[in-house]
């Protein structure tokens, strides 16, 4: 049995960590800092433009050495190298995993099954660049001869979460006068609200679906098509729709000129695809040069991950810290706390990246996993979160490791309330303060010295000892955003290697899709006919639904 498919919990490295946890579990972050005056300077990493402080973690230098030993026992370096070589490490689908090829420079070479994938990638990027230039310059015109003013991306999952997050993060780099919107949910209110104030004659849709058969995407695309053709006629489809897909036959049947179809490959998973043609809407907004900088940022961290020893390898160290808390301290969630409103959708993006990748209960060989996997990722931008859920982080009973993300230079800055100072300084002072309070808290003795009323000391005591990592960068640029995304991509991969998981499939998503397709006719028929194998709960809910839809009243019947 290969290392990545074996039971990591049976290794001596895992057992050493268990014993170490038992020996040191009472040790606090406050005590770790008191014992090591250089800790705050030395437990840091630099990867590209990212400065990463992980000193406020419940780990000693010996803990870190044991975690690196675990990574080597799991074969992290071997699996990493196999991925970069283009080996078929996605074994359940018999595919290579080559999102890293999307950001290789044009002069690089990577051959898979005798084929140069870098040349393929740059051919598509060049076509995207030509198209985005035509749109941005006004050369591309709609059916009435007017230039396009709004691009609407229709996709779901990785075809929405990635480009939507990136567009919001980099919207200050948008310089074409073209706004971008996103439709993903099959709830019709999403499409209706998005199109409410748009003009069909100046709107272009990007329909992103690899197979051009995704139910939610094609349902929304069909309604967008009706919206366009009812105003402009059938001939308008070719001027107001383009596709990100590999199914030329279905794209053509929809009415899209296949010259305006931009492909990507089976070796790119949806949640890793924002650097491919799936990012076309982003390129239209920020231009091909800024998009190239975005890809260069990914590549910077790809090289760091590929070339740096595990002891100083930022994605590997952060992944190992995640395993430490999930599997040795029982932490179930991870808070993502960007102190940047522009990164407002970054936690949701990471939810898919982490939870779809490692939310598995069997290893890549199909055998059951003997430990916890797949932490729940969640979060909100600071300082909003401080007035929502930080109370639980500071004084609750749950262990919640957190990642703070901040920038030295703001996209925009304004003076403080008194007309002086800097709003950005206020924002960042909150980041630094929150990470400090989470780590060190406030003791009863400190409160007593501050003359706190005795009956309030217990209420105001902050236990501290909540671990956090702080990731800082000079400024949120296209390159830095690419670096941040790649940092988390490779973290997720390393965690998956340690668990023996196949991190690049998502079979759990498929069954719900299949059953929805089977149930939809029962909802549409309205005649009370239900599949004979339905459970009583689902049958009762569908009957209630029929009653309300037909008569405006709820009628709950027995199956």
UniProtKB/Swiss-Prot annotation:
User: Which catalytic reaction applies to this protein?
Assistant: alpha-D-glucose 6-phosphate = beta-D-fructose 6-phosphate
Q: Which GO terms describe its biological process?
A: gluconeogenesis; glucose 6-phosphate metabolic process; glycolytic process
Task: Report the InterPro entries cross-referenced here.
Answer: G6P_Isomerase, G6P_Isomerase_C, Phosphoglucose_isomerase_CS, SIS_dom_sf, SIS_PGI_1, SIS_PGI_2
Which controlled-vocabulary keywords does the entry list? Cytoplasm, Gluconeogenesis, Glycolysis, Isomerase, Plasmid
Which residues does UniProt mark as catalytic? Answer: 356 (proton donor), 387, 513
**Subcellular location, record wording:** Cytoplasm
Give an example GO cellular component term for this record. cytosol
Mind listing the GO molecular function terms for this protein?
Answer: carbohydrate derivative binding; glucose-6-phosphate isomerase activity; monosaccharide binding
User: Under which main EC class is this enzyme filed?
Assistant: isomerase
Write down the Gene3D superfamilies for this protein, in alphabetical order. 1.10.1390.10, Glucose-6-phosphate isomerase like protein, domain 1
**Family designation:** Belongs to the GPI family.
Q: What does this protein do?
A: Catalyzes the reversible isomerization of glucose-6-phosphate to fructose-6-phosphate.
> Which NCBIfam families does this chain map to?
PRK00179.1 (NF001211)
Q: What name goes with this protein?
A: Glucose-6-phosphate isomerase 4
- Gene it is expressed from: pgi4
């Amino acid at each position: 049995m290969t290392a990545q498919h074996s039971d990591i919990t049976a290794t001596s490295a895992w057992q050493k960590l268990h014993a170490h946890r038992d020996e040191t579990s009472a040790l606090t972050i406050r005590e770790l800092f008191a014992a090591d005056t250089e800790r705050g300077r030395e437990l840091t990493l630099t990867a590209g433009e990212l400065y990463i402080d992980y000193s406020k973690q419940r780990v000693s230098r010996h803990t870190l050495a044991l975690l690196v030993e675990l990574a080597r026992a799991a074969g992290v370096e071997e699996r990493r190298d196999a991925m970069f070589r283009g080996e078929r490490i996605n074994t359940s689908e018999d595919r290579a995993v080559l999102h890293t090829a999307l950001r290789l420079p044009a002069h690089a070479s990577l051959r898979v099954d005798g084929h140069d994938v870098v040349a393929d990638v740059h051919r598509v990027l060049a076509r995207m660049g030509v198209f985005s230039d035509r749109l941005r310059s006004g050369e591309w015109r709609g059916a009435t001869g007017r230039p396009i003013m709004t691009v609407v991306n229709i996709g779901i999952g990785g075809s929405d979460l990635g480009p939507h997050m990136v567009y919001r993060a980099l919207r200050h780099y948008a310089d074409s006068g073209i706004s971008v919107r996103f439709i993903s949910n099959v709830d019709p209110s999403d499409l209706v609200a998005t199109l409410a104030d748009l003009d069909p004659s100046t709107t272009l849709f990007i329909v992103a679906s690899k197979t051009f058969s995704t139910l939610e995407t094609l349902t929304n695309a069909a309604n967008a098509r009706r919206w366009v053709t009812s105003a402009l006629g059938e001939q308008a489809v070719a001027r107001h729709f383009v596709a990100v897909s590999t199914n030329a036959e279905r794209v053509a049947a929809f009415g899209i000129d296949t010259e305006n179809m931009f492909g990507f490959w089976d070796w790119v998973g949806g949640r890793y695809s924002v650097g491919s043609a799936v990012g076309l809407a982003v390129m239209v907004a920020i231009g091909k040069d800024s998009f190239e900088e975005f890809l260069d940022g990914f590549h910077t961290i790809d090289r760091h991950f590929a070339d740096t020893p595990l002891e100083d390898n930022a994605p590997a160290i952060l992944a190992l810290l995640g395993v430490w808390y999930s599997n040795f301290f029982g932490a179930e969630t991870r808070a993502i706390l960007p102190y940047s409103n522009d990164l407002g959708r970054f936690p949701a993006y990471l939810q898919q990246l982490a939870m779809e990748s490692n939310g598995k209960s069997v290893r890549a060989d199909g055998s059951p996993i003997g430990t916890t996997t797949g932490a729940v990722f969640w979060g909100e931008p600071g300082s909003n979160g401080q007035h929502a859920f930080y109370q639980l982080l500071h004084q609750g009973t749950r262990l919640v490791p957190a990642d703070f993300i901040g920038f030295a230079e703001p996209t925009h800055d304004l003076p403080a309330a008194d007309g002086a100072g800097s709003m950005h300084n206020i924002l960042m002072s909150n980041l630094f303060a929150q990470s400090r309070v989470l780590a060190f808290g406030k003791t009863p003795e400190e409160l007593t010295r501050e003359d706190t009323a005795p009956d309030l000391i217990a209420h105001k005591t902050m236990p501290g000892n909540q671990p956090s990592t702080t990731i800082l960068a000079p400024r949120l640029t296209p390159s830095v955003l690419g670096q941040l995304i790649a940092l988390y991509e490779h973290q997720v991969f390393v965690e998956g290697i340690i668990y023996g998981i196949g991190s690049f499939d998502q079979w759990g998503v498929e069954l719900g899709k299949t059953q929805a397709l089977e149930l939809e006719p029962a909802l549409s028929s309205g005649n009370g006919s239900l599949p004979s194998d339905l459970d009583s709960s689902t049958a009762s809910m569908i009957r209630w639904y029929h009653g309300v839809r037909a008569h405006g009243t709820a009628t709950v019947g027995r199956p």
